[in-house]
């Protein structure tokens, strides 16, 4: 699911027509604000050969300037019919420079991204500063992750696990056009960490592209969520033994790797899409939840350990 598939046009941008018609404003300032087709060549009809401004008619359309049935003003003393329209006040010249053809059909499929000034990210320190600016110091999330009184812990963990899956799936979906096998041939977080995927049990994990890794991860998570023996959907269902260690921790450990890849390799795109607040809030929620129930070890955070510690201390 990809975000922001809207089409935008830069201020002052003109677009070419694809339907064989284009408005002409070359003579608009000289024709009292009237707009004529490109084939029109307005001229003055002079009566009795006298070039008198008082007797000059400023015609609006091409067909009104030509004689009707071969007759003109001097033939048999008759004048050809002339169609006139009320005069309009001419708009300021600066408003006549660019014309937008609303019949244009866009052929591109990429959104117009307007990067914000000063948002180039090169180091983890830059990411930390942006996170600090987009997150407040209120302890709302700190209280939100705590187990409510009387709530089953396994149920609480299962609900949040599915919630984090949906959040990460949505966040990654927003940058899929920037993350491809060509741009991200390996699932890495900086050059120091690479995450491998094992397609079958008993076989060693192999290196895959970032999109392939995320695709396999999301399918693997969905298969577990659909397994009634692991995530019972009925109230009478029970969770398996070792649910936290065998199910929850492996899922969250692997979901975290998507956060790491986005932060280390696609944070500029997140800034261009103006999703940094959404990403930082989701990531902080994830870290606080993992800390509250001791679900991840420091080694699991890899290159984002410093950022995780910063979020925990806020």
UniProtKB/Swiss-Prot annotation:
Gene Ontology MF terms: kinase regulator activity; metal ion binding; protein kinase activator activity
Gene3D superfamilies per the UniProt record, alphabetical: MOB kinase activator
Region (Disordered): 29-55
Binding positions for Zn(2+) per the UniProt entry: 179, 184, 261, 266
Domain of life assignment: Eukaryota
Subcellular location: Cytoplasm; Nucleus; Cytoplasm, Cytoskeleton, Microtubule organizing center, Spindle pole body; Bud neck
Compositional bias (Polar residues): 29-43
Bias (Low complexity) ranges: 44-55
Post-translational modification: Phosphorylated by CDC15.
GO biological process, one term: regulation of exit from mitosis
SUPFAM superfamilies (alphabetical): Mob1/phocein
Residues the record lists as Phosphoserine modifications: 34, 36, 80, 229
GO CC terms: cellular bud neck; chromosome, centromeric region; cytoplasm; mitotic spindle pole body; nuclear periphery; nucleus; serine/threonine protein kinase complex; Sid2-Mob1 complex
One Pfam family it belongs to: Mob1_phocein
Keyword match Transferase: no
Keywords assigned: Cell cycle, Cell division, Centromere, Chromosome, Cytoplasm, Cytoskeleton, Metal-binding, Nucleus, Phosphoprotein, Zinc
UniProt keyword annotation of GTP-binding present: no
Note: Present with 5020 molecules/cell in log phase SD medium.
Function: Functions as an activator subunit for the DBF2 protein kinase. Binds to DBF2, which is required for the phosphorylation and activation of DBF2 by the upstream kinase CDC15 in late anaphase. DBF2-MOB1 is part of the mitotic exit network (MEN) signaling cascade, which regulates release from the nucleus and activity of phosphatase CDC14. Required for inactivation of mitotic cyclin-dependent kinase for exit from mitosis, cytokinesis and G1 gene transcription.
Protein family per UniProt: Belongs to the MOB1/phocein family.
Description of how the protein assembles with itself and partners: Interacts with protein kinase DBF2 to form the MEN DBF2-MOB1 kinase complex.
Protein name (record): DBF2 kinase activator protein MOB1
Species name: Saccharomyces cerevisiae (strain ATCC 204508 / S288c) (Baker's yeast)
């Amino acid at each position: 699911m990809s975000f922001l598939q809207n089409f935008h046009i830069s201020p002052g941008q003109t677009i070419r027509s694809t339907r064989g018609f284009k408005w002409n404003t070359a003579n608009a300032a000289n024709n009292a604000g009237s707009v004529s087709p490109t084939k029109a060549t307005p001229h003055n009809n002079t009566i009795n050969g006298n070039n008198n401004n008082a007797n000059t008619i400023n015609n609006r359309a091409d067909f009104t300037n030509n004689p009707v049935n071969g007759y003109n003003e001097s033939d048999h003393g008759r004048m050809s019919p002339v169609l006139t329209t009320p005069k309009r006040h001419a708009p300021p010249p600066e408003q006549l420079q660019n014309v937008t053809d609303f019949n244009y059909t866009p052929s591109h499929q990429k959104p117009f991204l307007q990067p914000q000034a000063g948002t180039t990210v090169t180091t983890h320190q830059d990411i930390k500063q942006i996170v600090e600016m987009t997150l407040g110091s209120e302890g709302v999330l700190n209280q939100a992750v705590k187990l409510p009184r009387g709530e089953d812990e396994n149920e609480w963990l299962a609900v949040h696990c599915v919630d984090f899956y949906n959040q990460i799936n949505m966040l990654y979906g927003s940058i899929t056009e920037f993350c491809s096998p060509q741009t991200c041939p390996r699932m890495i977080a900086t050059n120091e960490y690479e995450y491998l995927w094992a397609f079958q049990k008993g076989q060693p994990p192999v290196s895959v592209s970032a999109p392939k890794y995320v695709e396999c991860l999301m399918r693997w998570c969905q298969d577990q969520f659909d397994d009634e023996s692991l995530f019972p959907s009925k109230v009478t269902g029970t969770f398996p033994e070792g649910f936290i260690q065998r199910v929850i921790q492996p899922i969250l450990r692997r979901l975290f790797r998507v956060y790491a890849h986005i932060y280390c390799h696609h944070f500029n795109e997140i800034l261009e899409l103006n999703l940094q607040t959404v990403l930082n809030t989701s990531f902080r929620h994830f870290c606080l939840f993992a800390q509250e129930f001791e679900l991840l070890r420091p080694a699991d955070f890899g290159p984002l350990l410093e950022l995780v510690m910063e979020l925990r201390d806020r």
